[in-house]
Structure formats: C-alpha cells, structure tokens
Amino acid sequence: MGFREVGLSESEYKRIIELLGREPNDLELELIGVMWSEHCSYKSTRPLLRTFPSKGKYVLQGQGENAGVVDMGEGWGFAFKVESHNHPSAVAPFQGAATGVGGIIRDIIAMGARPSVSMDGLFFGDASLQKTRNLAKGIVEGIGSYGNAVGVPIVGGKTFYSPCYNDNPLVNAFSAGFVRLDKMASSQTAKPGDYAVLLGSKTGRDGIAGASFASRELDEDSKASKPQIQIGDPFEEKLLIECCMDLLDKKLIASMQDMGAAGILSSSSEIAHKSGCGIDIQVEKIPLREADMLPWEIFLSESQERMLLIVEEEKLEPVFAMAKHYGLDCAIVGEMTDSKRYRVYKNGVLEAELPTSILGDTPEILWPAAEPKDLPARQAIELSKLASADPAKDLLEMLPCPNGHRKDAIWEQYDSMVQLHTIAGPGEPAAIVEVPDTHRACVLTMEAEPYKCWTDPYTGASEAMALSLRGLWLTGADALGMTNCLNFASPEVPEKFYELKECLRGLADTCRALDCPVVSGNVSLYNETATDRIYPTPLVVTAGLVVDRDRVIRAGRTKAGDFIYLVGAPEGSLGATRYQQAKDGKPLGKTAAPDAEAEKAFRDRALKTAQRQLANSGRVVAGGGLASALANEAIASGVGMDIELAPRGGVETLLFSEGGARAVYAVSPEKAAEFEAAWSGFPCVKAGKAGGDKFSWQGILTLPLEELAKAFTEEK
C-alpha cells in the first residue's frame, strides 16, 4: 500500500518515517492516514482556531473536548456544539442528515449531559431546481425522522438558499444538553489499568473511511460512495442515551468518548493521548455485524450509536448489567496502559504499534493566502440600479423569496415540544428553553451571512457573529459562549484560503471585542466540485442566559395601540443584502463592519429593557432590512402598523438596508417614557404605532396585512 492511497503527501510520509524510525506497515499506514486527514486533524485550520478567545467567566469546558460547557447557575452546566455532515448529506440526503443528528447528540452525551435541544443550519441550492427540492426533502425528512424518534426537540435553525450550494448542500447539526456540574464527563480522565468498553451497536462496514471521504472535494466517484454513508437507528440511540445517563448517575464511568469520524480508532486514540496513557486494543473482541471484516475496516468503520467507555475493573460488572438491562451490546475491547503506545492485537498477535502522539499530535499546514483577484468586482455596486420605483412591490417580492418566506414546510416535520421545556421554538428569531428545576432560561441564536462573507470575508463573518449576539441581547440574555461550524472550499487554493483566514479573523476579533468566548466548533473544508464551490459559510450558534424566564422579550407580541420604536441607526448598508441580491442576481457590495462600542451600548440597553419589561415585543433588524423586520412583526402579531419614518436619501436604503446594531420594539404608551430613558445616549426614534389591518409606511406604501401575510407564507 502506498502513502497516497491513504491521502498522505510525500512530505508527510517522510515525517512519519522520521517519527517511527521505520516504515509503517499497511495497517499502521491506514490508521495514520485517517488521523492525519483534514477531517480528523484540522491541520489546515488549527493555527487559525488558536486565535479564538476561549476563556470566560462562564466557561467550564472550552475547546478540546467533545463539546463546550458553560455555567447556567444553580448547579447546572450547558453542553453544546455544532457539527457538519455535508458530504454524506450530498450523497445520501436522508441518512446523511439523520446520522448527522445522531452524531452530534452523542457528543453531548459524552460530556455527561442529557441531550435536550437540537437545531440545524441548512444551505440548499437554487430553490427552483427539482434537484434542490429533492435534496432538501431528503435532508429535512432525515433530520425530522431521527430527531423526533430519539426524543430531542428541534427548536430552531437557519435555512438559506443559493445556487452555490447546488452540488454541495450544507447540513450543520447542533445539539445541546444540561448536566449537573458534579456529573460532567470527560475524555481526558482515563488511567492505566482501566478497561475500554464498547457500548451500543455492533460494528459493520457502513461509514468506512468516512473521514477521508469528507476530506476531499465531491466528484462523481465520491457521489457513488454509498458504503461511506452511515446508517442510523434513533431507537438504538435513545437506549444509548438512557443507559449512559444511568451509568453516569451511578458514577460507573471513568471517561467517555463518542465514536464519530474514524470510529474506534479516533475515540480510543484520543482518550489515550488526552489522558497521557497508552491503550491496547484486542480487535477480535469488537462485536461485529459482518464476520469477515478486516482490522482496518473495523477500526475505520463509522457505524452509528456507539460509545467508548473507560471503566475501572471493579465497576465492570454493574456496567455490563446496565447494558443488558437496556438491551445494548457491551464488550471489553482493550485496556489502558502507561506505555503511551497505541497497540492493536488480533488473537494475541501484535498487528500495529504506534506512539499515541503520532495519532494525536498531527502536523499543521499554513497554506499561502492571496486576496481573490475578483474581490474588487465582488465589492463593486451601482446604487442607481438599486433604486426602488415601487417599494410595495419590492417588499411583496422579497417576503416570499426562498430566503424570506416562513419555513413552515420544514418546521412542521419537527417535534419542538418533546421534553416539554421549549418556551420559544421554530419560527421565532431566538430559541428559548427552560433550565431544569430553575426559573432560568437558556437562549440560542443561529446565524450565517454567506452573501456578506463572499463580498468581504472579514466583515461578513464579523456581522454574522454580531447579529447572533444582538438576537440574544434583545431577549434579555447575556452571552455565555459560542460554537461554530466553518464551511469552506479547498484551503489549498490561495484565494480560497484567504477567505477562510479572513472569516476566522473576523469571528475572533468580534468575539474578543464583545466578550463572547468560543467553546467548541467544527471545520468542514473541500465543499466544492470541479465546476463550483460554496460561498464562505461560517455558521455561529451563541448561547445566553436569562436569570428570570418571565423577563424575556420575544417577537410577535405587538399589541394594538403600542408605539413602534426603532433603536439604532435608521439606515445600514445595501451591500450584499437580500434586496441587492434580488435586484442584481448575485451578491455585490460591502457591508459596514460592526462597531464594537455601538454593539456594547446596544447590549447594555437591550438587557435593561428586558429586565424592566419595558417592551411587549422586540425584533432585531436583519435579513431584508427594516421593512422586513416590521412586516414580519406585524404578520406574527396579527396587527397592522402605521410607520412614519422618512428616508434621508433613497427609500430603498431606509427600507431594505442591513447591518448595524438595530432593532424594533413595540412599547405600551404608559411605558414609553421609561423606554426612551433606558435608551438615552443611543439612537432611538418613535417610528409609528400599531393598530388596524393595514401595514402602511407614510408616503411610501400601504398594504393590507392579509396580503402581506399571504406573501410571507407562500414560496416564490
């Protein structure tokens, strides 16, 4: 077997020989090749990921574990992470998406947390194509089928359409769970003499080499790679969840690791390396679905619904009894040692022996970066072409566009209320769930700005992060931490690596400026084909805390007679907006970078507004601009509005510009003076009043609310 067959470069192979002092055998080469793959090693992004701020007063566990954990107070932690399942979902939409949900749930289990929340970020191609509709149908059905059956509510997400995702749909699965602080688990606490126990499904050939599959661009051969797609069983996962929760409650587990990419290999080598131990694996003891599997197939299989437990000898018997109670396979497959060696035995014969460091301390690559030659063209914009001759018509066309209309067809397939702790779910700007046994609430926002990242990677990523935080602050939640899924094309092309590097710089700078640590994340590269590539798509999910869940501000609660306020600058930028893209047919123009001081001023006042309950309803100005924010609020509340704001220049800038710390609030007249006082020192203007059955903007447009609602709920 040659090194190129396992995805290694010549320089990497030479480095392996130097580290080992010999040439690896075929099995060792397979093991190293997978662990050094982009998907497992993050070799192209680790230097950049280290620039993220990772410490904060609420951070209990930062990057480097199965998921990040933040402190929710009253003895509760919140474990959360988002992860990609892009390539598998492009090849087998239903199973690819379903197993993406299952995999991220097991990351949460591995922290000792009960999975309590799921969300998904979905990026599809041209909505008018039958191919896109087929992919979207399979992906959404896969998510709903698995999530509903396993009993974890899907409480929100983000869905975005653009032709750049025609051949590369993105499926970013988020999961989270609550854990008592004294029951947190870790993958770094194994000790020599402990036993490695495989719990869950038998190992088969599904998903073999899935990590390598996800480390290269999609082509016709890879699209035919069905064996590299895992097959999920949500009912087995449900049993696995309950068994692991019981084992943790009884303190029977010393350490734990999900079996995700690279299966048994990655889980066992990561536990050994992180714990400073070695491990001896007995391959013949691994329960198999197919008797003729070769050692490399067994180690690289990504069969689902499996966990690797590290168990002290005296606790083996109750662990096996618990597994039997739940009807799960359970087997001792290895033992921790003090050798710092990763050894594979088959029937007593040593098949492979490697230092754990060669599997855990993988090499890094800092690719050359060069500004794309067409970046100035991407940023050029002719404002005269964007003039709105008929604002009412433009608004009615934007609301039903793929990125504007309600996503009921997706949400209705998801169970958002199972577990009975969802306060605000799909269709609301922020998801809100109860913290168990307290009066607290956890708030989650998910954002991505592909258009803006395409025309200006640094500013686009900064705006996505700031937008996610604004959504938290408006509800009354202070940010505890962020997780991200970084979806990009090949890092090997300097212009594409520039986009990656600048997006990550934008995220890091914004998180640092606005005091939001990064606690976990995922990187997905090579999202491209021979003919197309995705826009840079960093997706962020931010978690926040409300101490009193009765003091949150939600959208869609405007009442007749309320004053409508706009806080923040009346106008933003038209560059790379939903309106601009609709007019020009492609994203063009730059957006304004977030102003850290303005963002902090917005944060402080938004938190005060929620704590004092000075508004009945609130909504951040985001995609589609001020007109979309007000129209969505009127539709959701079932009440008309009369808006009196006058444009400074072109009406399209007032109505449809995006960016900046801006929001609309609905305030009862008796609280108006106190609301205005709370926003003193920050732009705040009374924009109009709620009431009636029409959405009117004085001198600009008048539309029946019924017509507006119909446009919003119809697909264009």
Model-derived regions: residue spans:
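Glycine-/charge-enriched secondary-structure boundary and capping motifs
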Residues: 1-6, 10-12, 16-18, 23-29, ...
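Non-catalytic terminal/interface segments that mediate subunit docking, oligomerization
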Residues: 36, 40, 49-99, 103-105, ...
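Short, hydrophobic beta-strand segments that form beta-sheet elements in well-ordered domains
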Residues: 38, 154, 176, 664-667, ...
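Short amphipathic alpha-helical surface patches that mediate protein-protein
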Residues: 33-37, 50, 261, 324, ...
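N-terminal amphipathic, basic-rich helices that act as targeting or association modules
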Residues: 2-71
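Residue-level signal for secondary-structure boundary elements
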Residues: 24, 28, 40-44, 57, ...
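Alpha-helix N-cap/helix-start motif at coil-to-helix transitions, marked by capping-box chemistry
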Residues: 7, 234, 597-600
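Mobile "lid/hinge" segments at catalytic clefts and subdomain interfaces of large enzymes
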Residues: 65-326, 332, 336-341, 345, ...
